[in-house]
């Protein structure tokens, strides 16, 4: 499921992640999927 996200879904994940500085840093290094799941658990889509 995680491989088939739409751009809209990815953008909403980024907005959540960017509110958390540590998540944002991880997103820059490892990508939004890895960062979101590390901080917030499974992606809800």
From Swiss-Prot:
- This one is known as Osteocalcin
Q: Where Ca(2+) 2 is bound, by residue?
A: 15, 18
Q: What are the BP-aspect GO terms?
A: biomineral tissue development; bone development; cellular response to insulin stimulus; glucose homeostasis; negative regulation of bone development; osteoblast differentiation; regulation of cellular response to insulin stimulus; response to vitamin K
Q: Which family does it belong to?
A: Belongs to the osteocalcin/matrix Gla protein family.
Chain sites annotated for binding Ca(2+) 3: 18, 24
Q: At which positions is Ca(2+) 1 bound?
A: 11
Tissue distribution is: Also found in smaller quantities in dentin.
Q: Where in the cell is it found?
A: Secreted
Domain Gla span(s) in chain numbering? 1-41
Protein keywords: Biomineralization, Calcium, Disulfide bond, Gamma-carboxyglutamic acid, Hormone, Metal-binding, Secreted
Annotated Gene Ontology cellular components are: extracellular region
Q: Which organism is it from?
A: Lepomis macrochirus (Bluegill)
Using the UniProt record, give the first listed, main subcellular location. secreted
Record note on modification: Gamma-carboxyglutamate residues are formed by vitamin K dependent carboxylation by GGCX. These residues are essential for the binding of calcium.
